[in-house]
Amino acid sequence: MADNEFDIDAFFSTEKKSTSSENQHCGFIAIVGRPNVGKSTLLNKILGQKISITSRKPQTTRHRIMGVDTDGDYQAIYVDTPGLHIEEKRAINRLMNRAANSSLSDVNLVFFLVDGTHWTNDDEMVLNKLQKANFPVVLCVNKVDNVQDRNEVMQHMMEMSKKMNFVDVVPISAKQGKNIDVLRKHVRDHLPKAVHHFPEEYVTDRSQRFMASEIVREKLMRFTGDELPYSVTVEIERFDYNPETDGFHINALILVERSGQKKMVIGKGGEKIKTIGREARLDMEELFGRKVYLETWVKVKSGWADDERALRSLGYIDDL
């Protein structure tokens, strides 16, 4: 096994009842929408554990991530996508849009997430793509818990329901888990009879190395300013399990584009990078169930977000 990683199912597993392949149903559900509308939060809530990072800032999700939910004969494979957005000024933005678009191929159902309070040009762009595709779509009106006036929500839902022939229009709160059961029912109704793609204990297709890099990036987004998240990425240079310490030894390289950003990440007296490292380590220990020894470095790599060769080496093109 590469990089001395444990088998992924040792860490991303749940106890499920085994089932005969004769009665199995399996299919793919794409979760799409504009940036920062709650797609990753919804996926985490459906799975009952965190596999996709979240923050208040748009475009937190950069990679296509699969979440696997197996319940008896039914296996639903959810595809969390980067938010589709109109502006494609940089190579990384173009790749994120391509990753999101490629997720719309050969799916059995689409969850289209929108905000319960307003409709944007990015929402319209996603809608146009869905109208051209031949997939059943459930419109998920998220963040309804933020709206006090019930009539306002109903009016907003009525207006949006006219935009396309949706399978259903469901008000949800991804954060609180409201109406997740309704979405699950739609999933079951659309899963074809097919052999399961993943063993029943799997919850994600992503490796521990990938999850470690995403956790560090999440902490960077939470503890730094508004400009930095779009100019930073994380590369895991070492991911080893040491039986003597019964823990993971992880080296994370944080790449920024300018020296000023490096100073921002490190912080006065190194306090910010210490906080980022500590919070990331605690999350990794909870996720992996082992002690984690995390070391972080910050390096300036000018123009990485516009360099397709660099983006390929960092795993962004693997999603396409």
Curated annotation (Swiss-Prot):
Q: Where in this chain does the record put each Era-type G domain? A: 25-193
Q: Which cellular component terms (GO) are annotated to the entry?
A: cytosol; plasma membrane
G2: where is this region? 59-63
One Pfam family cited in the UniProt record for this chain = MMR_HSR1
**Which Gene Ontology BP annotations are present?**
ribosomal small subunit assembly
Where is this gene product found?
A: Cytoplasm; Cell inner membrane
Specify where the region named G5 lies, as residue ranges.
Answer: 172-174
Q: Which InterPro entries match?
A: G_ERA_dom, GTP-bd, GTPase_Era-like, KH_dom-like_a/b, KH_dom_type_2, KH_sf_prok-type, P-loop_NTPase, Small_GTP-bd
Q: Where is this region: G1?
A: 33-40
Region: G4; residue ranges are 142-145
Specify which residues bind GTP according to the UniProt entry for this protein. 33-40, 80-84, 142-145
Q: What one GO molecular function would you report for this record?
A: GTPase activity
Q: How does it sit in the membrane?
A: Peripheral membrane protein
Query: Oligomeric state and partners?
Result: Monomer.
Give the UniProt family note. Belongs to the TRAFAC class TrmE-Era-EngA-EngB-Septin-like GTPase superfamily. Era GTPase family.
Q: What's the stated role of this polypeptide?
A: An essential GTPase that binds both GDP and GTP, with rapid nucleotide exchange. Plays a role in 16S rRNA processing and 30S ribosomal subunit biogenesis and possibly also in cell cycle regulation and energy metabolism.
- Put simply, this protein is called GTPase Era
